[in-house]
């Protein structure tokens, strides 16, 4: 079974965790922005709005 040879330093560990957390924060912000856009009806690229559905029928 593969095991690490040496203990990872705290600074290296903290850098990696900071990177992961930053990436997660960026993705969360994108998700919130997309959700707000959909809820306010400003998005035209995800779901068709109710007005467009009425025109098609």
From Swiss-Prot:
Region (Disordered) residue spans: 1-23
User: Which species is this UniProt entry from?
Assistant: Trichormus variabilis (strain ATCC 29413 / PCC 7937) (Anabaena variabilis)
Protein name per its UniProtKB record = Large ribosomal subunit protein bL32
Q: Which GO terms describe its cellular component?
A: large ribosomal subunit
A Pfam match: Ribosomal_L32p
**Gene3D superfamilies reported for this sequence:** Single helix bin
Q: Name one GO biological process term.
A: translation
Drop me one GO molecular function for this one.
structural constituent of ribosome
Q: Which UniProt keywords apply?
A: Ribonucleoprotein, Ribosomal protein
């Amino acid at each position: 079974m593969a095991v690490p040879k040496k203990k990872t330093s705290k600074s290296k560990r903290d850098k990696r965790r900071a990177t992961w957390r930053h990436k997660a924060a960026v993705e969360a912000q994108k998700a919130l922005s997309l959700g707000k856009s959909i809820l306010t009806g400003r998005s035209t690229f995800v779901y068709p709005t109710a007005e467009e559905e009425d025109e098609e029928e």
